[in-house]
Amino acid sequence: MARGRSSERAGRRAEALAALRLRLTGWRILARRLKTPAGEIDILARRGRMLAVVEVKRRPDRATAGEAVLPAQRRRLARAADWVLARGETLGAGGVEGLRFDLIWVDRLGLPHHLPDAWRPDGS
């Protein structure tokens, strides 16, 4: 059980670092650990009219971080994003013109790395 709590704390730290990275680059954090009927979104962020669904992973490099987001999880995140878009009030003032799925991985040194538009719901 202690290992589970330790992993949970490490995951929360990674998400906090990811949110800080986003804020420092002009993104507004709309939600963290947003629960939807389709699943949880780690971070929902907005910059201008762009909305980003951000998945956060603790991994040593980009390759292993990308591999950690399996196709089933990508589909769940796409359904969760659809749910968010249908509920519009969580998006703040003004409409959204774009939606993308980003990946932020936090390496062994605790440094967050941002991969914008990491995947698309159609599998590309």
Across the structure, where does each feature detected by a protein language model lie?
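Acidic-basic catalytic patches of nuclease active cores, encompassing PD-(D/E)XK
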Residues: M1-R32
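Active-site metal-binding core of divalent-cation-utilizing nuclease and nuclease-like domains
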Residues: L24-L51
